[in-house]
């Protein structure tokens, strides 16, 4: 008996994350890509812009009602912050059963939406058809902090450095290689969206200082943690090993991980555990690819979870 594929569409596919999503969908044995919306690329063949996709599908310029009318089983919104609402409203009105995954920050604080960081929240998934994908920095911070969350004596301080792909494709100083050359660009040093996101999700205040670097992809997150009780390096290392023992995408390493080694891969490396004299302050380093585990890979994990498939299907 032939099993009908699950149909899926992407809105906002011109960006770097959209390109990664297309590759993952093309590798998924149970998904069929039925539309890809991009105003800038409308009319062009998807295969001309994606190495992993083979077929005659072309980009279309679709408004919210047109997306809803496509009646896809799954829709992924890969739009800038503040742009998702019309698409959500149109799908809610005509296709509420659609599985909708939003990669922007628009619904991360909405309790009606499942917040999908599988390694930390999959136990709370209860069949929701609306899934909010976490931020890239926010993913790194939460994974680095969680094993010691109950031991915290104060707000974690998080120094984040991202490749410039994290600034999107719309030209700006933060994705201009000429301005970033030999440079490190601090921005939004208080009250960043991901600072608020992590503080809300973990239930503890977090202090976050983001920077953009000249490399294209990958995040390094260095986290300073003050502890209520002294812990040795060995005890701290053991807590991380225990917490993530059954998480295939998370690797606990001894040395501080390098972003160049994580770029282009689906997982997270956490390591570099360094304890200050007195054993009540520890520094932890996490690295991940902002376009993959920070966006597209995580969306695919959430999709697989919601549809009852192996969470790592298509994630090679």
Curated annotation (Swiss-Prot):
<feature type="active site">
    <location>
        <position position="136"/>
    </location>
</feature>
<keyword id="KW-0521">NADP</keyword>
<dbReference type="GO" id="GO:0006526">
    <property type="term" value="P:L-arginine biosynthetic process"/>
</dbReference>
<dbReference type="GO" id="GO:0005737">
    <property type="term" value="C:cytoplasm"/>
</dbReference>
<dbReference type="InterPro" id="IPR000706">
    <property type="entry name" value="AGPR_type-1"/>
</dbReference>
<keyword id="KW-0055">Arginine biosynthesis</keyword>
<dbReference type="InterPro" id="IPR036291">
    <property type="entry name" value="NAD(P)-bd_dom_sf"/>
</dbReference>
<keyword id="KW-0560">Oxidoreductase</keyword>
<dbReference type="GO" id="GO:0051287">
    <property type="term" value="F:NAD binding"/>
</dbReference>
<dbReference type="GO" id="GO:0070401">
    <property type="term" value="F:NADP+ binding"/>
</dbReference>
<dbReference type="GO" id="GO:0003942">
    <property type="term" value="F:N-acetyl-gamma-glutamyl-phosphate reductase activity"/>
</dbReference>
<comment type="pathway">
    <text>Amino-acid biosynthesis; L-arginine biosynthesis; N(2)-acetyl-L-ornithine from L-glutamate: step 3/4.</text>
</comment>
<protein>
    <recommendedName>
        <fullName>N-acetyl-gamma-glutamyl-phosphate reductase</fullName>
        <ecNumber>1.2.1.38</ecNumber>
    </recommendedName>
</protein>
<keyword id="KW-0963">Cytoplasm</keyword>
<comment type="function">
    <text>Catalyzes the NADPH-dependent reduction of N-acetyl-5-glutamyl phosphate to yield N-acetyl-L-glutamate 5-semialdehyde.</text>
</comment>
<dbReference type="InterPro" id="IPR000534">
    <property type="entry name" value="Semialdehyde_DH_NAD-bd"/>
</dbReference>
<dbReference type="Pfam" id="PF22698">
    <property type="entry name" value="Semialdhyde_dhC_1"/>
</dbReference>
<comment type="similarity">
    <text>Belongs to the NAGSA dehydrogenase family. Type 1 subfamily.</text>
</comment>
<dbReference type="InterPro" id="IPR023013">
    <property type="entry name" value="AGPR_AS"/>
</dbReference>
<dbReference type="InterPro" id="IPR050085">
    <property type="entry name" value="NAGSA_dehydrogenase"/>
</dbReference>
<dbReference type="Pfam" id="PF01118">
    <property type="entry name" value="Semialdhyde_dh"/>
</dbReference>
<keyword id="KW-0028">Amino-acid biosynthesis</keyword>
């Amino acid at each position: 008996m032939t099993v009908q594929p699950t149909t899926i569409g992407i809105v906002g596919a011109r960006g770097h994350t959209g390109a990664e999503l297309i590759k993952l969908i093309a590798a998924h044995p149970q998904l069929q890509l039925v539309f890809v919306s991009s105003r800038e690329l409308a009319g062009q063949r998807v295969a001309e812009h994606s190495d992993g996709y083979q077929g005659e599908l072309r980009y279309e310029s679709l408004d919210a009602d047109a997306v809803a009318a496509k009646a896809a089983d799954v829709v992924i919104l890969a739009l800038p912050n503040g742009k998702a609402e019309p698409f959500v409203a149109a799908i809610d009105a005509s296709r509420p059963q659609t599985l909708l995954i939003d990669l922007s920050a628009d619904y991360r604080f909405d309790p009606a939406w499942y917040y999908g960081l599988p390694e930390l929240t999959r136990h709370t998934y209860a069949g929701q058809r609306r899934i909010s994908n976490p931020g890239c920095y926010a993913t790194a911070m939460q994974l680095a902090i969680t094993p010691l969350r109950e031991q915290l004596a104060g707000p974690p301080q998080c120094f984040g450095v991202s490749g410039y792909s994290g600034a999107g494709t719309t030209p700006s100083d933060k994705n201009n290689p000429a301005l970033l050359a030999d440079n490190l660009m601090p921005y939004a040093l208080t009250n960043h969206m991901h600072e608020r996101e992590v503080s809300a999700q973990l239930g503890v205040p977090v202090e976050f200082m983001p920077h953009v670097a000249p490399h294209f992809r990958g995040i390094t997150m260095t986290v300073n943690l003050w502890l209520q009780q002294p812990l040795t390096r060995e005890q701290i290392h053991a807590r991380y090993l225990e917490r993530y023992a059954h998480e295939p995408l998370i690797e606990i390493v001894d040395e501080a991980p390098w972003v160049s080694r994580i770029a282009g891969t689906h997982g997270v490396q956490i390591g570099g555990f360094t304890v200050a004299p007195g054993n009540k302050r520890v520094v932890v380093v996490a690295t991940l690819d902002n376009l993959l585990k920070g966006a597209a890979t995580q969306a695919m994990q959430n999709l697989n979870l919601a549809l009852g498939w192996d969470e790592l299907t298509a994630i090679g």
